[in-house]
UniProtKB/Swiss-Prot annotation:
SUPFAM superfamilies: Ribosomal protein L4. HAMAP family: Ribosomal_uL4_B. One of its GO terms (molecular function) is rRNA binding. GO terms for cellular component: ribonucleoprotein complex; ribosome. Pfam families: Ribosomal_L4. This is Large ribosomal subunit protein uL4. It comes from Fusobacterium nucleatum subsp. nucleatum (strain ATCC 25586 / DSM 15643 / BCRC 10681 / CIP 101130 / JCM 8532 / KCTC 2640 / LMG 13131 / VPI 4355). Belongs to the universal ribosomal protein uL4 family.
Length: 209
């Protein structure tokens, strides 16, 4: 079974924990990772880009000049797509870019991403009894001690209990704090170190195991 190191808030290793190989020890499926990552990035798009067709542009109701006798090419409206100020042909309109991803496929992608992180030694467990008052320097000291100085993904099990941890970590420039139900492939791949609280680890194993 895969084994994760357990640390306290001081950054000292206090033990290890065996985790479910079905969640943290599988062979990463790159095809599924790409599919789910693409879907997550697509779903994050606003989809508000909009243009007006010739039917939507103001004006252009009358023929700009007579059909014959001017020597110019015939025109029926000043709002045709080839005219300055005219409508746009095949331009974007508000739409949803979301792609359907089956639950089993998404879970496989999450397990693949977590397994890749574990194989690289970039997942650790945080065991602590809470923080009395929010202090960013406590978290700075922690990430320095566990060699997680670059980009950190904190996964907390209970945002009420872990609220001071959230307040302490959110000041870090490259830190992201999520709950287990918010974890996505994008953040697992983007952030260098994944730091799970014990409660979050139990939830992740229960949901994905």
């Amino acid at each position: 079974m895969a084994v994760l190191n357990i640390y306290n808030l001081a950054g000292e290793q206090t033990g290890t924990v065996e985790v479910n190989d079905a969640v943290f020890g599988i062979e990463p499926n790159k095809v599924v990772l790409h599919e789910v990552l693409t879907a997550e990035l697509a779903a994050a798009r606003q989809g508000t880009a909009s243009t007006k067709t010739r039917a939507m542009v103001r004006g252009g109701g009358r023929k700009p000049f007579k059909q014959k006798g001017t020597g110019r090419a015939r025109q029926g409206t000043i709002r045709a797509p080839h005219m300055v100020g005219g409508g746009v042909t095949f331009g974007p309109h508000p739409r949803s870019y979301e792609k359907k991803v089956n639950k089993k496929v998404r879970n496989l992608a999450l397990r693949s991403a977590l397994s890749a992180k574990v194989a690289a030694g970039n997942v650790l467990v945080l065991d602590y009894d809470g923080i009395e008052t929010p202090k960013t320097k406590v978290i700075v000291n922690l990430v320095n001690k566990v060699d997680a100085k670059q980009k950190q993904l904190f996964v907390v099990g209970d945002l009420i209990k872990d609220y001071n941890l959230y307040l302490s970590a959110r000041n870090l420039e490259n830190a992201v704090i999520l709950q287990p139900n918010e974890i996505g492939v994008y953040w697992l791949l983007k952030q260098e170190k994944v730091i799970l609280t014990k409660e979050a680890l139990a939830t992740v194993e229960e949901v994905l195991g």
